[in-house]
A protein has these predicted regions:
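Intracellular loop-helix junctions on the cytosolic face of multi-pass helical membrane proteins
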Residues: 1-22, 115-116, 120-126, 150-339
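Substrate-agnostic recognition of the 12-TM MFS/MFS-like secondary transporter fold
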Residues: 31, 64-70, 127-195, 336-339, ...
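Juxtamembrane helix-start elements in MFS-like secondary transporters
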Residues: 55-66, 125, 170, 354-362, ...
Length: 459
């Protein structure tokens, strides 16, 4: 038993550490920044609920608008391909937008009267909620592109690496990327546990001061991503100097170190179709037509289907079938509706969950998600994406039953029959512990396939 445990630990954790390369670090730093961004999650929930008075329905509508930038990842990714040599500028732009969003929220928490003198607090919050996802999606598409660049095409002697070695490197890097995101989440969960310890018993002014401290600490997020871009530049210069010392000329260096994406031409179908998508979404959303969301969904689905058809023409037959099947499976998986902010507010109002308990739940979820990423590493590598998503769908359905049961009073019945031991918090802890390890499993094989198999000009 001990030998088997030691072998599993070596195969799933130590091996991943042995496969780590310095060139992986820049995109991983951008991913860490994405993970650390969750630092303000609990603060935002309670601040909006306690001080801004916005309804869960309003937040759900705002979430629709905040989700539009993420729906534009395809054209933004194409823009990164077009401006490959200048993609670092997009990380700087994203960092500036994220910093602006955080500074707005810091102002709302620390100086609400001054902020309200310029425009309403609700308008400031909406502006912050829109700026933040734009910044994060810009950084995310660049980080995805950086993962392609981080996997070397040649070894230290300038010899071309075999496809099998690069495929393993891509899978390792995507796994490390999920580890970086979740590791950032673990870090912020620990900070939240420490910051919110006993906060429910503090006076209002003291709570506000803690909220302001958290938003101030969150300004480290854009700094981390910018540092990753600077490190990537230094690593590229180091690699070029090392190969130059071995006698390679500048033309050979460019072939070995630079992506062929530098030579691609704009795909006006992708860019034009994306403009149509934005026009449909904004015009219908602003006009507040009846069935507006349904119109936006059908319109955007038509545009995306057309763009997918254009993309499929660039692939070989096997890759075309794989991408199409993957897209359908992921679409259905992602289309499953979630409870939104209403679920968290119900836990706060009805179940009595406070800041410190939600922080502990977040910590448990982050740690076990990280554990699940290691524990299911072989499962992700050996199973198809369709199998993985089907497994996650069935498991997620089963694990949603305890929350549904608590809505109908399950926690009251269990508490009455266990002397108060199995109450709402106990059920929430167990459910979170079971559900969390599955959190990132679907993403790793999909991203690894894209990095390894997509055409060089359409990564």
């Amino acid at each position: 038993m001990l030998a088997a445990t030691r072998r599993w630990f070596d195969d799933n954790i130590l091996e991943l550490g042995r496969e780590m390369r310095l060139s992986y670090l820049p995109p991983l730093m951008v991913y860490v920044a994405a993970g650390v961004s969750g630092l303000t999650g609990i603060v935002g929930t309670f601040f909006v609920k306690e001080y801004l008075g916005l309804s869960a329905a309003f937040l759900a509508a705002l979430g629709f608008w905040a989700g539009i930038p993420w729906a534009l990842k395809m054209p933004l990714g194409h823009l990164v391909d077009l401006a490959w040599r200048h993609k670092a500028g997009l990380v700087w732009l994203g960092a500036a937008l994220i910093a602006a969003s955080l500074l707005i929220m810091l102002g709302l928490v620390a100086e609400p009267q001054r902020m309200g003198g310029i425009m309403s607090l609700e308008a400031w919050f909406v502006l912050s909620a829109i700026l933040s996802p734009v910044g994060y999606v810009l950084q995310d598409v660049v980080a995805d592109a950086m993962t392609v660049e981080a996997v070397p095409r040649v070894n230290d002697r300038g010899e071309t690496l075999p496809p099998e070695a690069r495929r393993l490197m891509n899978t390792t890097l995507q796994t490390l990327g999920r580890v970086a995101i979740i590791g950032g989440g673990v870090l912020v969960s620990l900070v939240n546990v420490l910051m919110f310890r006993g906060v429910e018993s503090l006076p209002n002014a003291a709570r506000i001061a803690i909220y302001a401290q958290v938003y101030g600490m969150a300004l480290v997020v854009p700094a981390i991503s910018v540092a990753g871009v600077l490190l990537a530049s230094l690593i590229k210069r180091r690699d070029a100097a090392r190969l130059r010392a071995r006698g390679f000329d500048e033309t050979s260096l460019r072939a070995m170190l630079e992506s062929p994406a530098d030579t691609i031409q704009p795909d006006w179908w992708i860019l034009g179709g994306s403009l149509v998508f934005v026009a449909i979404s904004v015009s219908v959303g602003v006009s507040q037509l009846e069935f507006g969301q349904e119109i936006i969904f059908l319109g955007s689905l038509s545009v995306i289907t057309f763009l997918m058809a254009r993309l499929l023409r660039e692939l070989d037959e096997n890759s075309r079938r794989t991408l199409l099947g993957t897209a359908i499976v992921i679409f259905v998986f992602r289309a499953m509706p979630g409870p939104g902010a209403g679920s968290t507010w119900w836990m706060i109002d009805v179940l009595g969950f406070d800041q410190s308990f939600l922080a502990r739940l977040s910590l448990i979820a982050s740690v076990l998600t990280l554990f699940g990423l290691f524990g299911f590493r072989r499962f992700m590598g050996e199973r198809s994406i369709a199998y993985i998503v089907g497994f996650l769908t069935l498991t997620g359905t089963l694990l949603s039953l305890p929350t549904l049961g608590m809505y109908h009073g399950l926690h009251e019945w269990t508490a009455a029959h266990t002397g108060g031991i199995v109450d709402a918090r106990f059920i929430a802890l167990i459910d979170t512990a079971l559900e969390s390890p599955l959190g990132q499993i679907a993403m790793v094989p999909m991203l690894a396939w894209i990095a390894n198999s997509a055409p060089a000009n359409l990564k």
